[in-house]
Amino acid sequence: MNNPNSNVQIIEDPEYGVILVCQNLELADQFEDFLTEKHSVLFHIKFERNQVSFFFGKTNTTSKVKELFSQFMLTR
């Protein structure tokens, strides 16, 4: 089985803040459900051909987004 974490990158952009980029579309869909249904987290999403980007803005930190993604992975 592939490691789902290898399909995810968390970056901090000076203009957009913290961005989680997921190259597994099924995992991204599940993560979006987790964010909206379980945590009511505010984010913007950008769908591209082979990846989905979650924009969390400048008010979040990479460590908070990593923790949120870790919580999501524990629910799978």
Where are the predicted features?
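Short, ordered beta-strand-loop transition motifs
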Residues: 11-15, 45-51
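Charge-rich, low-aromatic oligomerization/scaffolding segments with amphipathic character
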Residues: 31-35, 61-73
